[in-house]
From Swiss-Prot:
This is Chaperonin GroEL 1. PROSITE patterns: CHAPERONINS_CPN60. GO terms for molecular function: ATP binding; ATP-dependent protein folding chaperone; isomerase activity; unfolded protein binding. HAMAP family: CH60 (MF_00600). It is an enzyme of class 5 (isomerase). GO terms for cellular component: cytoplasm. Forms a cylinder of 14 subunits composed of two heptameric rings stacked back-to-back. Interacts with the co-chaperonin GroES. It catalyses: ATP + H2O + a folded polypeptide = ADP + phosphate + an unfolded polypeptide. It comes from Parasynechococcus marenigrum (strain WH8102). ATP binds at T29, L30, G31, P32, D86, G87, T88, T89, T90, G413, N479, A480, A481, D495. GO terms for biological process: protein refolding. Together with its co-chaperonin GroES, plays an essential role in assisting protein folding. The GroEL-GroES system forms a nano-cage that allows encapsulation of the non-native substrate proteins and provides a physical environment optimized to promote and accelerate protein folding.
Amino acid sequence: MAKRIIYNENARRALEKGIDILAESVAVTLGPKGRNVVLEKKFGAPQIINDGVTIAKEIELEDHIENTGVALIRQAASKTNDAAGDGTTTATVLAHAMVKAGLRNVAAGANAITLKKGIDKASDFLVSKIKEQAKPIADSNAIAQVGTISAGNDEEVGKMIADAMDKVGKEGVISLEEGKSMETELEVTEGMRFDKGYISPYFATDTERMEAVLDEPYILLTDKKIGLVQDLVPVLEQIARTGKPLMIIAEDIEKEALATLVVNRLRGVLNVAAVKAPGFGDRRKAMLEDMAVLTNGQLITEDAGLKLENAKLEMLGTARRVTINKDTTTIVAEGNEAAVGARCEQIKKQMDETDSTYDKEKLQERLAKLAGGVAVVKVGAATETEMKDKKLRLEDAINATKAAVEEGIVPGGGTTLAHLAPSLEEWANGNLSGEELIGANIVAAALTAPLMRIAENAGANGAVVAENVKSRAISEGYNAATGDYVDMLAAGIVDPAKVTRSGLQNAASIAGMVLTTECIVADLPEKKDAAPAGGGMGGGDFDY
């Protein structure tokens, strides 16, 4: 395909145009008075949402060059979402502000590479400052505050997430399900999550989220490699007669057997999914035994004289629900509390007996997975559109609370970044010079962008609010919900330090990359062939 090549200022301006479009679409959702965005869907009802990264993923522009700008800034949102699970809109607004100011300087003749060095140094300085300011989470009240802010000021959701964390512990897992009623409910069940995803993406049952969800499946556990499909045939025939799904956890499944499973899954003969067993060596075997206890099944291992081809239905485990994505598997089982309790006691004894710190750590991990359980939040709403929006908000809230537990909290509402701007300017003036100093000042100027946008979305003057906040004490900021200046920590308006840090780092990284762009190579739009001429009427000198 023919390519279009654009250089220098033209290239950067085209990128900027795409970045402007995406940033504006996402920024309208920022803050307690941020608005929603409607996404048109080719199939099904339109989606009304308030989630930055979801909006960013939907935007595709007709112009290939502008679309490259959209893709670059989308990366800042996606990376922040992957690292912290929230703060995607803030990352987009920050990246946009840095790019706009940086491009002005590059157009005026500044060296883009030196500017980028200044931006990177400023970013490192700010990350260390955010770590200094972060306060550890003291109690479930602080967790509830983080959840409330991330869920769009929904106190009920914040409290529910705090309760869930109390019940399953910091090591436990909180997952989301679509509920059957209007109310959002919390349900805590025994369960286990491990870091292995499906072997083949063809096992996914939900293609939009790329997840395999199996309800009430049988679970086949084995510590051997499954190479031949003949080994599986007897058990597959027994499962097919029951009409229930099957989940296979094995050391590995080789090509022939895997191909057979995939074909059966795609043809609808058997709803099956397969994952590799977690861990290595003896530890893998121990984890498989944990799963056998949890699911009330048997580990099919030759050490116990059991062979795969002789496996019976009663040897398989069962679960209420299994959710598998590309990286993780969550097994929610119930009704086997006594056996699980006995297994936990056994692991605790092993922990007491071992002197190795590493072994203790791994045993603690197994204990948390076995005893921690899974809290399921059942999302309730009046309509499907509202449910999808609520689910995305809850997902953000759960991720934000986990991030807060990891790295602590800082004053929210864009306050922390705005207060860091004067510190950065002071540090940069003392430590940097020339164009590196200009790069750092670009970051300093961009730090107030999220606060200004939050204020503007609430109908206030962003520049005035930003100056007022900078002149106040470090924990004081602007409460956009009420229009007052308050102590943010006391008012419960807090952000996880990890979310603020990730957003800033990713924004600085993308801004640096855009500024140092000198040439874009993109596809030329394909010319559509003109419609062929119609046939003549015949009999005359001309075709009409």
